[in-house]
């Protein structure tokens, strides 16, 4: 068995829209791996997505101390990035109870409830009605 199996692993689950991310924090050098691929490649080098993923670690100043291993599915890249952010924040809370307050004030622990509204019958989309003709 390798020595990496003996290290402490912190788990967190994050959700956003239809995305679900299972995040593991392992003591390391700060690399981000998403679904077996480097984080910047998976997120198409988009600075907004990368910033969202790194935000909880940067809030606590731990961005070079833990490797982030992520398994994420569902939704698009925006939802996945925000799900990873929430999962990482929850894993950091598991690391130490003192981390909860700064993460909460920055909004990393809040679940964003916005989701796609369902389409209603008689309408073209969720709220778009067919053109109204008075006569």
Swiss-Prot record:
Residues 116-135 have a biased composition (Basic residues). Keywords: Ribonucleoprotein, Ribosomal protein. One of its GO terms (cellular component) is cytosolic small ribosomal subunit. Gene3D superfamilies: 3.30.230.10. Residues 97-115 have a biased composition (Basic and acidic residues). GO terms for biological process: translation. Signal peptide: none annotated. Coiled coil: none annotated. One of its GO terms (molecular function) is structural constituent of ribosome. The keyword Electron transport does not apply. Pfam families: Ribosomal_S9. It comes from the Bacteria. The keyword RNA-binding does not apply. Residues 96-135 are annotated as: Disordered. PROSITE patterns: RIBOSOMAL_S9. Belongs to the universal ribosomal protein uS9 family. HAMAP family: Ribosomal_uS9_B. This is Small ribosomal subunit protein uS9. The lineage of its organism: Bacteria, Bacillati, Cyanobacteriota, Cyanophyceae, Synechococcales. The gene is rpsI.
